[in-house]
């Protein structure tokens, strides 16, 4: 009985993936379509959005990061889907 209970606990932990994984937007446009999310790698606990002007366009990069880059036009956040 104890073996069965232990097996169920292990299977539950594996199936639920108790390790938290961050999800960030990855599109390179001003607005993103629904579902354009990336599951970040282990250790990447921030989402970021970097924008800058190039010629007559605004360029945007979004993604995951292990640290928050301290640049002028970078927005960082630490919740899922927050780098709008």
From Swiss-Prot:
Expression by tissue: Expressed by the venom gland.
One GO molecular-function entry: acetylcholine receptor inhibitor activity
Keyword Disulfide bond: yes
Protein origin, superkingdom: Eukaryota
Disulphides: 24-47, 27-32, 40-64, 68-76, 77-82
Keywords attached to this entry: Acetylcholine receptor inhibiting toxin, Disulfide bond, Ion channel impairing toxin, Neurotoxin, Postsynaptic neurotoxin, Secreted, Signal, Toxin
Location in or out of the cell: Secreted
Signal peptide residues on this chain, from the entry's feature table: 1-21
Annotated Pfam families: Toxin_cobra-type
Major subcellular location class: secreted
InterPro entries: Snake_3FTx (IPR003571), Snake_toxin-like_sf (IPR045860), Toxin_cobra-type (IPR054131)
GO cellular component: extracellular region
Residue ranges of the TM segments: none
Homology family: Belongs to the three-finger toxin family. Ancestral subfamily. Orphan group IV sub-subfamily.
Function description: Binds and inhibits muscular and neuronal nicotinic acetylcholine receptors (nAChR).
Protein's name according to its UniProt entry: Neurotoxin BM10-1-like
């Amino acid at each position: 009985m104890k073996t069965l209970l232990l097996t169920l606990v292990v299977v539950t932990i594996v199936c639920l993936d108790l390790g938290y994984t961050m999800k960030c937007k990855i599109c390179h446009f001003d607005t993103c379509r629904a579902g354009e999310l990336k599951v970040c790698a282990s250790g990447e606990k921030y989402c970021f959005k970097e924008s800058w002007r190039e010629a007559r366009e605004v360029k945007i990069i979004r993604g995951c990061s292990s640290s928050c880059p301290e640049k002028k036009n970078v927005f960082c956040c630490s919740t899922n889907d927050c780098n709008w």
